[in-house]
């Protein structure tokens, strides 16, 4: 299961998981993003968390439970996924998109009991920890992109004046794929 599955990170994670043989379930917000997950990124199933009853939708999409959860959101989405975690499950934390701030410390369901009874592992993933493998990753990704196995979507806005609105739009979930700001025209 991958949260923010239609975004820049989630879409790549889901596609790579599919390439290596995993069954993939994406969670995204809105019908267009769910369609993108299925049709463009090849997720086996996709769930619209905004459509309500996320718990029931997860049970339907993951009848055998969840072995691996790539968490880009934290918060209520993650709380729902953890209820479906299998014994020995693994949670990779890459982002906390649903949390506007960590001050004060957010309150809500705690994960410790889920991890304990499921004998699960939760670990942070920070890309900089793998700098020594960038060359290897770049070669694999380039091969997959050239072969049509990994697709991506970019939205490029021209001008630094668009940066504040672009960032605010990310937090409102308005982006489809990676949102970029081109500061100046490319030199010719």
Cite the ranges covered by each PLM segment.
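Terminal helix/beta-alpha structural elements that buttress the NAD(P)+-binding lobe
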Residues: 1-188
